[in-house]
A protein has these predicted regions:
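Phosphodiester-processing cores and adjacent nucleic acid-binding clamps
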Residues: 48-346
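Acidic, Mg2+-coordinating catalytic module of metal-dependent nucleases/exonucleases
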Residues: 1-52
Length: 346
């Protein structure tokens, strides 16, 4: 449609923010041509203002300072790498470009990095090419949407689709093939609205050479800890441990959120009780701390909401991240965050 209206292609096609720009520009052009009629607005008063997407004019926050690392950091012998990152291919949910993810890994002297986009693997080819070109080991994963029954697509308010997010990471080429199968089947058999879904039946079938993380607050175990209690979460944990064995890891995130701190305490108890390895993560949705405002506006676009609408659950609220800690942190920042749990990085 854009090419028909303007006689040219637009740059950065399939970059989420630029796609939104092209859609908005096309809408205003159609209104100007009289295709959309509104008695209250004359077409002479319709004016499209080009957004400054490359150099965002959002309010800048105070420049971040490097966190000083405490002496317990000396107990951390390994280098930290980010294993839970979302790129712009998590459509309208993350602002990190693949180029920036790789360049930040280089800047922070990380020799590997992962992408785990929400519900799809659209960015894998580009990520693999750019990472290898820059001598960074690409770790390929996906944060899948998991439903009780991927093929069920009729629900009611009393019996909704009960989904959770699940991070799966390929160990090797065979693992990548299994993730690809899961992603394809999510779209061909499990698509419900905007959610391509898999289920435990598929996970068991395609688990070979795949690593499973317990995930963020939308993972099934953290959700059960918060909503149903430790016993229910422990029963669920046993399924993942039985299914993945040593390839199942408990993911610890520290975004300075009370509920998350409680989840971490329970996960650490599970780790000791069942001898499950833990990993530190940061659930990255944008690159720099000051990018949090732009990211929040992107979430508003996805929901059709105003930024002034408060974040939360229920009527009159919108979805959003609770603070500005979901950025691509340096090794020093992550080692400082987990200086009391060095084994989460070692």
């Amino acid at each position: 449609m854009y090419e028909s209206l303007f006689g040219e292609k637009f740059s950065d096609a399939h970059d989420a923010s630029f796609d939104v720009n092209a859609t908005a520009k096309s809408f205003f052009k159609l209104a100007e041509l009289g295709e959309y009629k509104n008695d209250d607005i004359s077409k002479e008063n319709i004016q499209y203002e080009e957004p400054k997407l490359r150099n965002s004019n959002f309010d800048k926050k105070i420049k971040k300072t490097e966190v000083s690392v405490e002496k317990n950091k000396n107990d951390i012998k390994s280098e930290f790498i980010h294993l839970h990152n979302h790129s712009q291919y998590s459509v309208l949910q993350a602002t990190s470009s693949i180029e920036k993810i790789v360049s930040k890994s280089i800047e922070y002297k990380m020799n590997a990095v992962a992408i785990t986009d929400l519900g799809n693997m659209f960015g894998v080819f580009k990520f693999n090419r750019i990472a290898q070109k820059n001598n960074i080991k690409p770790i390929i994963g996906c944060e899948f949407f998991v439903s009780e029954d991927r093929k069920k697509n009729k629900f009611t308010r009393d019996n909704p689709d009960k989904r959770f997010n699940q991070v799966l990471i390929a160990k090797n080429k065979d693992g990548y093939d299994n993730l690809s199968n899961l992603s394809s089947l999510a779209f061909t058999e499990g698509l419900y609205g905007q959610y391509p879904r898999i289920d435990k039946e598929l996970i068991k079938k395609y688990k070979k050479n795949v690593i499973a993380l317990s995930g963020n607050m939308f993972g099934v175990i953290p959700k059960l800890i918060l909503n149903q209690g430790i016993e229910a979460a422990e029963e669920e944990l046993k399924w993942w441990l039985d299914t993945f064995g040593e390839d199942f890891y408990l993911e610890l995130n520290r975004h300075d959120i009370d509920e998350e701190n409680h989840v971490n305490e329970v996960l650490l108890e599970f780790s000791k009780k069942y001898n499950i390895k833990i990993i530190a993560a940061n659930d990255v949705f944008y690159i720099e701390k000051e990018d949090s405002t732009a990211h929040d506006i992107l979430l508003c676009i996805k929901q059709g909401e105003f930024k002034s609408t408060p974040i939360g659950r229920g009527r009159g609220k919108r979805r959003g991240l609770k603070n500005d800690e979901y950025y691509f942190k340096s090794q020093n920042e992550m080692k400082n965050l987990f200086s009391d749990i060095p084994e989460a990085i070692n």
